[in-house]
Structures are given as C-alpha cells and as structure tokens.
Amino acid sequence: MTTIKTSNLGFPRLGRKREWKKAIENYWAHKIDKAELDQTLTDLHKENLLLQKNYHLDSIPVGDFSLYDHILDTSLLFNIIPERFQGREVNDDLLFDIARGNKEHVASALIKWFNTNYHYIVPEWDNVEPKVEKNTLLERFKYAQSINVNAHPVIVGPITFVKLSKGGHQSFEEKVETLLPLYKEVLQSLVDAGAEYIQIDEPILVTDDSESYEDITRKAYDYFANEGLGKYLVIQTYFERVHLKFLSSLPVGGLGLDLVHDNGYNLKQIEDGDFDQSKALYAGIIDGRNVWAADIEAKKQLIETLQQHTQQLVIQPSSSLLHVPVSLDDETLDESIAEGLSFATEKLDELDALRRLFNDNDLSKYEHYKARYERFQSQSFKNLEYDFESVPTHRKSPFAKRKQLQNQRLNLPDLPTTTIGSFPQTREVRKFRADWKNNRITDAEYQEFLQNEIARWIKIQEDIGLDVLVHGEFERNDMVEFFGEKLQGFLVTKFGWVQSYGSRAVKPPVIYGDVKWTAPLTVKETVYAQSLTDKPVKGMLTGPVTILNWSFERVDVPRKVVQDQIALAIDEEVLALEEAGIKVIQVDEPALREGLPLRSEYHEQYLEDAVHSFKLATSSVHDETQIHTHMCYSQFGQIIHAIHDLDADVISIETSRSHGDLIQDFEDINYDLGIGLGVYDIHSPRIPTEEEITTAINRSLQQIDRSLFWVNPDCGLKTRKENEVKDALTVLVNAVKKKRQESESTTA
C-alpha cells in the first residue's frame, strides 16, 4: 500500500483560554494599542502553527487564522468593501467597523455558516471596485515558512464566496468572472512563494442547487488550469455530500470530501468509480464538528477501503476544527466520560495514530485509542424511561381565543415593547459568578448580588418605559451552558470554548446521557423579579432544538429522541414558572434555522421534529399564559411555515442586519400570530436613531397586522455596555410612543 499523509483544514482561533478573544476585546476597549494586539495575535498564530506541527501533519493550514472572520478577510483581500465604508484605508480598523458597525454606519449582515453555529460577515457588492488590495494571505504563508512550518494556504473559493454575497447589479456568473483574475493573482503569488498546494474551500458545492452552477464552476477552474494553477489546487468540501463525478472532472490536483456528515454518499460514489484516481483524495474521516473520540478501528477499515480507490490518500478532519475546542489537557473531567472525548488536538493525534499505523506499522497509539474507545462504549448511558405520549403537543385553544384571554390578563398597550432577555454581563457580574463557582463567596452573598442586579435592572426598564420586562439572566453565563449545568445527562467543560461570531465565544455542553429535569432551574430569579413590579416579567428559557443544536450531541441514540428528552425537561420548567405566577414565558429557539440540513430531502423531517419538540415543551400551559419564542441571524424563507406551526403566541425575529430583507418572507404567508421584528442591531455598539427605528416599524407594519406587532431589539443585550443598552432602549421606547401618538391623533 502507498504511504498515507495527514493534513488539517483549519484550527481554532480562540486559544486554549480565549487569549484571542481577550486581546481583540481589549483593543476595542482601548486597553491595548494596535502594536500590542498585533504582537499578541502573532504569538497566538505561531503557537497554533507549532502546536499542529507537533502532531506530524504533512501540511498545516495557514489563512484560517483571522482577526474576526475568514469570509470578511476575503472581502478585504479583493476590496469588496460595503459602499458606506469605502474611501478609507483597508486595514484592521476598517475590518472591525464593517463587522461591528460604528457611530456613522451599520454593520454588515451576519449569517450562519451553513448549518453550524459559526457566523460570517456577508460580502456586499454594491458599487465595489474589486482588486487585490492587500495580500495578507501571502504574508501569513511567508510567516509560516519563516518558523519552519510546512504550510498550505487556505482561501475561500470564488463560487462559495460569491454565492454567500449580496447586492450589486452583476449576475452571479459575472461576479465570479470578475474575481477570477484577482484569484489568479493571489494564487500565483502563493505558488511563486513556494506553496506546494493551495486549499480552496468550496463548501457551497455540497448544497442542493450546486448542479445549477456547475457551468460557471467548470469555467472558473478551467481558467485556473489554463493559467497553470490547476495542479496546485485542492478543492475542499465539507458538511455534506458532493456530485463527485462532476467534481472529479475539474482540472485540479486534489479533492477534499467529508466522509463523516455525508450520510455515506461520498464513500458510495468513490466505490462506484466516480473519483478520478489521478487526483489526490483528501479524506475527511475524523469528525471536525463533534467532540466524540473516533472509532479508530472503523477509521482503519475506512482507510483500507479508500486505498483501493486512490494512490494519493491524505487523511484529515471532516471540516475545519474551528467548530470544536482546542484541547482536553486543561480539563478535569470524569475519566469514564473523558475517555470518549476528542477536541482539536486529540483529533490531530488520532490522525497521527493512523499515520503511524499505516506508514510505520507502529500500533502503540492506535491500540491506545482503540482501548479508550472500547472502554467508553462499554458503559451504558441509556438508563431512563420516558412517557412522551402523556404530554400534550397542542395548546388547548386556537390563537384567537388565547390572544383575547391574554389581552385581558396582561392589558398591554398598542405596539408593546420588550427585550429579548439578557442584560449586560459586566466584569462585576462575571467576577461574582466565578467567585461563587470557585467557593470564594457564599451562596447567600451570591444571591444578594443577583437580587441587587435584578432589582436595579427592573427599575431601569420601568424608568425607560418598557411594557414587558425581563430579569436580565445575570445568573447565566450562556443560554445553553446554563441549562447544561442543571439538567441531568449534560457535561459542562471548563475550557471547551468555540467561536460563534467575531470575539463571541460559547462553551457548548456535552450531552452524554439521558436528559432529565430534576429541580426548578429559573423560577427563583424570575419570581423575585416579578415581585418588584406590576408589569409582567418574562420567564426566560432556551428551547429543545437550540439546546441540542448548541450542544455537542450524543451519537449513541437518535437525535429526535435526545431532542424530545430535552423538550420534556423544558416542559417541566415551563409548568413550574406558570405555577409560580409567571404570565409570560419565552422559550428561545435561535438555532432552529441553523440546524436545517443542507440538503432539502432532509428538511421536512427536521422541521417536523423541531416543531414537535417545541410544542412538546410549550403546550401544557393554560390559554392565559403567553408563550414567546425568539430566533436570530437567519434566512427564514425555507422555514417560514414551520415558524407558524410552532404556534407561539409571540415570536421575535432578528431583522436589523438583514436590512429588512426578512420582511419579504411574510409576503407569501398570512402570518396571524404575534410577532416582533428586531428594530435595531445589538451586535454593534452604535446607538440607533428614532428615525431608523420608526422606519423599521413602518416597513414591518406594511406586512404585519398592527394588533399582532411587538417592538424589540433583535437579540439579547448581554454583550453590550450598560450605557449603550439604556440609550438604545430609550430611543426605541420614544419612537414607539410617537407611533402611538400618531395613531391616537389619526383615530381621534
């Protein structure tokens, strides 16, 4: 058999303990200057490269490291600058302003990266002049060479980049053709600098409509081949299957395929002879998106199968390791569960174990991982019985009747205002929580602090004039991790951070066993907040679909079973809140859209399961109890009917970063439930104007019945500063008051 090689597609940017995040946020807060930021990030990039080198990879990616987002990096590389930000020097400060907005201009749209919890900044083509502005990819490649790292450059391919863009008068094909000479310039510079191959990521080729743009895809890669570059290119795909016969016909040196999340189709196509054996096969055999250790014996057998179909085999993760934490080294976990886990560095070590086995006949690492996996699998985490049938999955009455009863009970004004749930997690809040978790303060001291913060923010909300209040979620570090800490069947790590967007990091819990509610989770804080005001306070919960999508899910039982187990746990908490007198309960599902499979053949079942789980969690309450939900960052056209089927009394949806595009989705559906379309972007420090909020309200009311419409920010306010929150909410409430006055004067 031929020698196998190992490679990687991308590595986590955050650092073991979020050094990347802290440096960038310190720069934004003017606590460090640009020179210190650059040095910190250079050191971290070097650490990442050398860490990967320790695992004997034949080639290490460079270009995956970023100050914010690799798609935004590509936009700046080719001078695809939003019109409102043009005329400035292309530098890191411009990058941050495009991503976050500033006092003068709104940020660019933020969209989920395929069906992951990562988000990219959408490129904007309106009135742009594409050119190679600053070849940072070449700089990073040369840096890797300078520290003796055998690296391959990584760049998002032209088909994917343009397909993920918006705006401009050119057609999709015209935009691709515009970029081809610029890609050629960058690719040639990398080859001239010594790149043995270039990883060109085209994940868009795994989607349903990829066959509709095969002609322009072929034209693009024929162009590169005619320029003498084809043999240096490896087209990487991930997250799903591809049309392998077409992909194999492209004049490139290699193809990267996901052999984990392809439902077996990529392997079948290889076995059917659709892979061009003159090319290198970059086989994604180690799961790049989940944290479970590989069944290394099964991977050995897979490699043996693949070797029958290629003479150039490179094994790698199924996708960039951006989606998993850095390392288990700093964790102190129950060994019986830790043996079943694998973070980024452990995944690279699994690749090294397989490389040693096949190339050197060295069984030591292989046997180690095989024994660990077998010990973990010998345990049983399926111990509980569930009565799914006894819990209702439909509300007692139709929405019209519920709305009448809720109006009588809540007595809310026209265009009611609220927020999405969380308020600023200040340094003081985080310190008190950390001190409590580390037993540096007593339970009583921590509860006193929480109650003081809740009381302070209840008063702030009342002073501003909001109609439905929230307690602020100061006891929660994350909307999923919090529930993972309290529900049976979850494991929460200390340093298992992954990047969500920009400097925002989340720590997904690990679901390892049966999920069960054992005690109230949120009742104490919510009831205390309600005791301070006559206005309704929302109970704040995270929904079953989001908890599952934002956790590392177990793989030993079907996904639907885990989702419904979580739904039953949330149902218990919903009933506990209702019994405690809470009149409005929000069950957030911001991740419902992101979990939608990339292939439409799987959509119907996914959405059916998601709707069922949400209704399982929310249908036991009385008609008078108002159920809210919230979704964000998404393109909802494909799921608008499922959103309606949730039968939530009120749904709030992020629209600000889409600049109103979402409202068009309501033109084709008679949406007859309560709805709030977020009227300003909380991900930017910029304070909206009354005029902007009024414009957003007016546009929304063109499509939505006024009696159903709510006014709110687009997401929780956890990441904002206190003064930003107060100022923005004051503007929001003032704009609504003027709208109410207009209505009163019109009807007078």
From Swiss-Prot:
| GO BP, sorted A to Z | methionine biosynthetic process; methylation
Task: Kindly give the InterPro entries that the UniProt entry links to this protein.
Answer: Cbl-indep_Met_Synth_N, Cobalamin-indep_Met_synthase, Met_Synth_C/arc, UROD/MetE-like_sf
The Swiss-Prot or TrEMBL record annotates one GO molecular function as: 5-methyltetrahydropteroyltriglutamate-homocysteine S-methyltransferase activity
Mind telling me which residue stretches traverse the membrane in this protein?
Answer: none
Could you confirm whether the keyword Cell inner membrane appears in this record?
no
List ligand-binding residues for 5-methyltetrahydropteroyltri-L-glutamate: R18, E19, W20, K21, K112, W550, E594
Q: Which cofactor does it need?
A: Zn(2+)
Binding residue positions for Zn(2+): H630, C632, E654, C715
SUPFAM superfamilies hit by this protein = UROD/MetE-like
Q: Which residues form the active site?
A: H683 (proton donor)
Q: Which NCBIfam families match?
A: met_syn_B12ind, PRK05222.1
Of which family is this protein a member?
Answer: Belongs to the vitamin-B12 independent methionine synthase family.
Name of the featured protein: 5-methyltetrahydropteroyltriglutamate--homocysteine methyltransferase
What is the species listed in this Swiss-Prot or TrEMBL entry?
A: Staphylococcus epidermidis (strain ATCC 12228 / FDA PCI 1200)
High-level lineage: Bacteria, Bacillati, Bacillota, Bacilli, Bacillales
Its gene name is: metE
